[in-house]
Every structure is written in structure tokens, then in C-alpha cells.
A protein has these predicted regions:
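Bacterial N-terminal signal peptides
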Residues: 10-20
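N-terminal secretory signal peptides that target proteins for export/translocation
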Residues: 1-6
Length: 194
């Protein structure tokens, strides 16, 4: 009896689509280190104080927001007992949601909400100072170590119609509210390497 490969191909394609649209960036190749690791370097004025800017943002409070009265009301209406434990909620409120525990480092915490690695990729392979210097100097391609520069598509993995509170998404406006740029003199040296 001869089998058709159509069913197998369909399963593979479905898996590829799910991975492509997963909010977990870089989970298959790189480990997550957590925002505390990022903060070690990205809190200084010389670096642009990215960490304090993130701490003041809604992203840093995304997990916490799932315990708010509004979130609990929405969850109840959808038959969800605890939004802080529901995969359909945490997938966009927690960095590395759904990632295997072997893919997260000791400093990782779900309480960090939508942390650095949700947008910039899992950081274990680019979090060392020497690696970052290689990236900024152009000798290490950022993508080769998991560092990504987020774009509209990155944001729309969560800011979309699947969210029960979605009211449209203006990428440029949203980008301005979370801007955490490097100082111009450092940015001039920065090369993504592809």
C-alpha cells in the first residue's frame, strides 16, 4: 500500500506557521537570560539608559497586568480562571512563555513581563560584553547570536486582533512611546551584521 506524503507535509507546514507566528523569539536556537542580565549594561547613561526606560513602560508590567480587575473580568468572560497561568494570555504577557525550562537562565523571571528578549531575541549568545562589542564593531553578525532589531512584524505578533483589548495598532506611535535608543555616538558605531 502506498502512502501519500500530503498529510505529513501539511503537519510540517502547520508547525512552521506556528513557529513563525510565535511571540517567543529565538527560542529554538538561543537561551533566554532575563532582563536582570540585560540591565547589567543597559542601565547607564553611556548606553542610553534603556533598562530604566523599559522599567517605566507597560511592557515591564505586562505579567502584573494579568492580575488586574480588568484582566480578571475579561478572563472570566472567556472561561479562564487565572490569566497569569493561561497560555493564551501569557504568550503575549511574558517573555519566553511556552519555552522549555532548559531554554531559560537563572536570572529569568515571568514577573518581568514583556522583557528585552521578547523584542530583541533570546540573549544568552549575545549578552557577553565581548560579543556586544563584536556586534557594534561589525565583526559579529547580530543575527548569528540571536540579536534582532524589532520591527512592525515583531510587535504585531501580540498587538493584533487576537488580543481581547485590541483597539488598533499604530506602529510608529507605539514605537515612540517605548523608544530606548542608544546615544548617537554609540549608535553611529553600531552595525547589525545582517
Amino acid at each position: 500500500m502506498r502512502r501519500s506524503g500530503g498529510a505529513g507535509i501539511a503537519v510540517l507546514m502547520a508547525g512552521a506557521v506556528l513557529l513563525a507566528y510565535s511571540p517567543v523569539t529565538g527560542a529554538a536556537e538561543h537561551k533566554f537570560v532575563g532582563t536582570a542580565k540585560c540591565a547589567m549594561c543597559h542601565k547607564t547613561a553611556a548606553q542610553g539608559e534603556q533598562f530604566p526606560k523599559w522599567q517605566a513602560s507597560k511592557h515591564s508590567k505586562a505579567f502584573e497586568a494579568l492580575a488586574s480587575p480588568k484582566a480578571l473580568e475579561i478572563a472570566k468572560a472567556k472561561g479562564i480562571a487565572d490569566p497569569q497561568k493561561a497560555p493564551e494570555c501569557i504568550k503575549c504577557h511574558v517573555t519566553a512563555a511556552g519555552a522549555d525550562t532548559s531554554m531559560v537562565g537563572a536570572k529569568y523571571s515571568v514577573k518581568d513581563g514583556v522583557g528585552c528578549e521578547s523584542c530583541h531575541g533570546a540573549g544568552a549568545d549575545y549578552s557577553k560584553k565581548s560579543t556586544m562589542e563584536g556586534i557594534t564593531g561589525g565583526t559579529i553578525p547580530a543575527a548569528s547570536v540571536g540579536l534582532t532589531l524589532p520591527d512592525k512584524t515583531t510587535c504585531e505578533k501580540c498587538h493584533n486582533k487576537e488580543s481581547p483589548t485590541f483597539a488598533g495598532f499604530d506602529f510608529e506611535k507605539a514605537k515612540a512611546t517605548i523608544a530606548h535608543e542608544m546615544p548617537a555616538e554609540r549608535k553611529a558605531k553600531y552595525k547589525t551584521g545582517g
